[in-house]
Amino acid sequence: KKYQNDANVTRLLHLDSETLLSLCPAEDKLFEVSKSGNVETTFGERPIVEEMNNAYNTFQGNVEYNSGRDLLVYSCMVFPYVAVYKQSGLKDWKLVSELKGAWDYSMSEGKLKFASSSPRGASELALTEDYIVLLQRDDTVEESVPREKAGRDLSTLPKSLFVYDYKLNLKKIINMPFPILRLCGD
């Protein structure tokens, strides 16, 4: 299958052999569903509604789809935010759960800037049959890292797994003795 090179898309999921879901963080609607190359619908409100010219960087994140439950999970990497959407049809997606962390930001010259004390979001996301697993820093047991230093600096990788049910109730925090780069689930 040939993909179009779309610089606005940062994540791409196959919902079935002909249907793609794209995360488009610079757009007003975060998600686009296309079937056989034709856009069928867009959905997903931005968690921060102010107009900004750095939305592409601000709303990048991870998306995973649980086909057994028809649920899409989105987690933002730049700030703590998780959303769960229920699919009832190709064009019918409804926000069913949302988890907003505490974040502090300001606007300057059209750019959204987070305070250095604001926590980052989950760096990875994985789904199991019954749980959402997020890789993120547990500030109660891990050293805090300045926002400027986090990112691709491997010395700042988180060591904690936050396990949620699909209603976004925290079930468990697993603090690992080593840093984690990637997650996968099945």
Language model region names:
Residues 2-4, 40-58, 90-117, 177-179:
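Surface-exposed loop and turn segments in beta-propeller and other repeat-based domains
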Residues 72-75, 113, 148-154:
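Short consensus segments that form the blades of beta-propeller domains
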Residues 5-17, 55-63, 120-124, 178-186:
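Repeated scaffold domains used in trafficking and secretory/extracellular systems
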Residues 25-29, 79-81, 139-143:
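Short glycine/acidic-enriched loop and turn motifs that connect beta-strands
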